[in-house]
Amino acid sequence: MSQHPSRPALIALLLAACLLVSGNALATDLDDEIPSQRPEVQSFIDEMVQKHGFDRATLNQQFAQVRMKQKIVDAITRPAESKPWFEYRPIFVTQTRIKEGVKFWNAHEAELQRAEAEYGVPPEIIVAILGVETRYGRHHGGWRVMDALSTLAFAYPKRAAFFRGELEQYLLLTREEGLDPLAVMGSYAGAMGKAQFISSSYRNFAVDFDGDGKRDLWDNTADAIGSVANYFKRHNWQPGAPVGSPAMVGSNRISRLLKEGIKPHTPVKELRKQGVTALQPLPPEAPAALIAFEKKVGRPDYWLGLNNFYVITRYNHSPLYAMAVYQLGEAIKEQRRD
């Protein structure tokens, strides 16, 4: 038998090699590329000048110092939320993070109580958000926000429109707040500060909670606490209402109910008629959504998520994120009570 590959096999091998080389070249080319060389960046600069009155020379100078990074594109294609629940939960709901949350709550009890009084959002939710996002303000991200947003706006077609909008919001934000756009650090997605607000959220929902005249989510814990609470209030958090409940499912309609999504759609009492029973008391008229959380072995854990669960997903659209926040907050509250 001949040991030489067939002609089709050779063609396939050559194509694979070309793809590999071109992929590596793309990664190499993108790293440290100066985006101002791209025509779409010049179009963006034109828009910022015409629409918002920015100085063209200043923007050209700033974009000449921006460096695009392949690692940013790589990171956004591998978010933690792509993991199954049984791998995701142990990242965030840990004894260390619970203890740190108790300590944070005790240190900032006055601000948390004031935030609850003003916005209706309980301390455990605010604390858990800050715990999941930045380990209570310790890890803000190691990327220049200008690099991150420019990379995603001009080299990540899947979400280019969104990040182009966030880059616009970022330049407006830094102008309004008197910040150097090339000096601000954040996440690979351009989220900033203790609360990891993206630029549009910072402009719309950040508050000066301590009254010092600045909205500072990097160094001012009071502002971070107040801003998270304001974000939840503005997204229709219902004070005193439950977040959700574990559920017992004895229905052959599970697939259909799960396909309805995470936005509450059916009253609890109607779901009960369809074989889905909350294991904790819930208002019978409250709309709910059935959500499954994958276990390593066996059937998933089923939960009914109510309005406040959905509100948590407005901070991060993943139900895994919302459940991690809820469970971390409950664990912190329980341990603090003991």
Residue ranges of model-derived segments:
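An acidic, Gly/Ser/Thr/Pro-rich helix-cap/linker signature
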Residues: 28-116
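Short, functionally critical alpha-helical segments immediately adjacent to catalytic or ligand/cofactor-binding
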Residues: 59-68, 122-137, 170-172, 228-229
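Bacterial N-terminal signal peptides
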Residues: 11-22
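Bacterial N-terminal signal peptides that target proteins for export
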Residues: 2-12
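Acidic, glycine-anchored loop motifs typical of Ca2+
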Residues: 209-217
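C-terminal soluble interaction/assembly domains
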Residues: 250-338
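Secretory-pathway/luminal and periplasmic proteins that interact with or process carbohydrate-rich
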Residues: 68-75, 134-144, 155-160, 176-182, ...
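Substrate-binding/active-site groove segments that recognize
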Residues: 145-154, 192-207, 228
